[in-house]
């Protein structure tokens, strides 16, 4: 149901009111801006180092785009599918460790000792809260500026990093080059949502060329327009000007988004940037091809992706076995479409050709 506002207008023969220019509508907010580049520095408080990027912000980017989340989830799923549980490392702990390593650039496992002081199990420690200590081998659990703080014993936390060329205290995720593309994609989606919630237009200019009776009439119009804020905010308004002209009042749209729409181009280009950063075949994360030839066979793309991307990640993760001193992590054979086998052998992998 719409609301009608009636604004009375006095005798137009009176002295004309002075010209008034009034802007209305809230500025469109954005998720993040270029200031994120200012975070690339490190400092310590005497006990632990702070990361070069806020870990809370980095965690929030996990959901900035379906392409980014799907690419991360694909790698985690392939690792989890091949991981074999051991007495020291559960599937759940490994999955959380793998997700942290790929999204946050750091994966942590805590050494849980038994009564004899030997390894009972390795448990996941969240990268969001772990901070390397200033003292070598020491780590801290920090739950925000005012939250709980826990100091781990020296040698109780295993850290696996994605190397960063600027420093060696924290790892940085290699997909970071596509961060701005992901945020651009999200901003484009948020703008489009606001466009539809705004009545399918991007704002307009209320142009009034009629001579009004007095300044109070212009103020009344301004007040009624200023009340049109928020979702479902547009109201009907009756303006009666005796002897007025046909085009005395005009509503002129600022932009016709339906006619000049860059939304699809922005989404496509930002998607390509993210897929390039993740080196992920598009058919493996549900992207529909727009060409007649398609993307090729999914199985062949999966095999190539596993060999070129998943195997190097798994090799890095196998370093935990040497650190813990036990075969903590192991991977099952991966059977390729052509019958060849990618098999773990010690801390590496070997491809056994079919036949």
PLM features: residue spans?
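A short alpha->loop->secondary-structure connector
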Residues: 127-136, 140, 147
């Amino acid at each position: 149901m719409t609301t009608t506002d009636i604004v009375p207008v006095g005798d137009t023969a009176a002295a004309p009111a002075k010209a008034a220019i009034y802007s209305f509508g809230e500025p469109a907010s954005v998720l993040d801006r270029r200031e994120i580049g200012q975070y690339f520095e490190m400092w310590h408080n005497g006990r632990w180092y702070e990361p070069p990027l806020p870990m809370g912000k980095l965690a929030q980017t996990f959901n900035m785009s379906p392409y980014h989340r799907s690419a991360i989830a694909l790698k985690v799923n392939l690792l989890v599918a091949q991981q074999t549980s051991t007495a020291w490392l559960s599937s759940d702990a490994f999955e959380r460790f793998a997700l942290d390593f790929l999204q946050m650039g750091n994966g942590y496992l805590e050494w849980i000792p038994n009564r004899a002081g030997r390894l009972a199990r390795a448990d996941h420690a969240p990268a969001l809260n772990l901070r390397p200590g200033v003292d070598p081998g020491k780590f801290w659990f920090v739950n925000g500026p005012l939250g709980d703080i826990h100091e781990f014993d020296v040698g109780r936390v295993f850290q696996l990093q994605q190397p960063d060329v600027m420093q060696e205290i924290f790892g940085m995720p290699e997909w970071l080059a596509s961060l701005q593309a992901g945020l651009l994609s999200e901003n484009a989606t948020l703008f489009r949502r606001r466009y539809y919630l705004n009545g399918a237009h991007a704002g307009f200019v209320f142009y009034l060329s009629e001579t009004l009776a007095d300044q109070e009439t212009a103020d009344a119009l301004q007040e009624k327009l200023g009340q049109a804020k928020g979702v479902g905010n547009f109201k009907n308004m009756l303006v009666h000007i005796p002897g007025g002209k046909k085009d005395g009042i005009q509503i002129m749209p600022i932009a016709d988004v339906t006619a000049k729409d860059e939304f699809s181009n922005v989404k496509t280009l930002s998607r390509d940037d993210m897929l390039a950063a993740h080196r992920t075949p598009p058919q493996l994360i549900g992207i529909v091809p727009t060409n007649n030839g398609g993307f090729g066979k999914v199985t062949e793309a999966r095999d190539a992706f596993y060999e070129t991307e998943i195997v190097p990640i798994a090799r890095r993760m196998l370093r935990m076995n040497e650190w813990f001193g036990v075969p903590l992590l192991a991977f099952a054979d991966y059977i390729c479409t052509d019958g060849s086998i990618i098999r773990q052998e010690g801390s590496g992998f070997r491809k056994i050709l079919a036949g």
